[in-house]
């Protein structure tokens, strides 16, 4: 199974970068994990609502252009479904059984465009709380790792 994470913005904090590297290393035995990091579209100073929508639309176009062909798209969105870690592991089990590869999408600071959200197969919320987008990447990788441990009946802290 292949798992792509498409995200807008670079990680600037060393502690987040080291966490991401650690989980990428831990995930190697379970499948090919790759991260596609895209540059943020500049938000104009004193941006209007229509300016912000244009930024989200442009980022959405960039994201969709970088999703690997045929991958099952899951957008991280505050209004998406909330899953337990066990339920999240079912997403991977189902994908594996159906021969699908997964692509998780993390937007920029303004979020994801309505057009992109309409184009994905699933919307997932990691929490009702707000996280920075780099932190979201780290939390997602940890949950992906946890999901594989659950699927394989391997121990992991609860």
From Swiss-Prot:
Family matches, as CDD domains: RlmH-like
Record key words, sorted: Cytoplasm, Methyltransferase, rRNA processing, S-adenosyl-L-methionine, Transferase
Binding site for S-adenosyl-L-methionine: 76, 107, 126-131
InterPro entries associated with the record: Alpha/beta_knot_MTases, RlmH-like, tRNA_m1G_MTases_N
Gene Ontology molecular function terms on file: rRNA (pseudouridine-N3-)-methyltransferase activity
Top-level taxon: Archaea
Broad enzyme group: transferase
Catalysed conversion reaction: pseudouridine(1915) in 23S rRNA + S-adenosyl-L-methionine = N(3)-methylpseudouridine(1915) in 23S rRNA + S-adenosyl-L-homocysteine + H(+)
UniProt KW Cytoplasm keyword: yes
HAMAP family: 23SrRNA_methyltr_H
Job of this protein: Specifically methylates the pseudouridine at position 1915 (m3Psi1915) in 23S rRNA.
Protein name (record): Putative ribosomal RNA large subunit methyltransferase H
Species for this entry: Methanocorpusculum labreanum (strain ATCC 43576 / DSM 4855 / Z)
């Amino acid at each position: 199974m292949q798992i792509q994470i498409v995200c807008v913005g670079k990680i600037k904090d060393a502690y987040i970068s080291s966490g991401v590297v650690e989980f990428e290393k831990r995930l190697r035995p379970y499948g090919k994990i790759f991260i596609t990091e895209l540059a943020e579209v500049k938000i104009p100073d004193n941006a209007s609502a229509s300016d912000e929508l244009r930024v989200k639309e442009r980022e959405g176009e960039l994201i969709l252009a970088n999703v690997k062909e045929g991958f099952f798209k899951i957008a991280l969105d505050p209004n998406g479904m909330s899953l337990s870690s066990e339920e999240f592991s079912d997403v991977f089990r189902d994908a594996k059984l159906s021969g699908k590869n997964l692509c998780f999408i993390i937007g920029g600071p303004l979020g994801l465009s309505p057009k992109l959200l309409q184009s994905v197969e699933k919307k997932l919320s990691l929490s009702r709380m707000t996280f920075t987008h780099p932190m979201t990447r780290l939390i997602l990788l940890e949950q992906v790792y946890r999901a594989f441990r659950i699927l394989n009946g391997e121990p992991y802290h609860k």
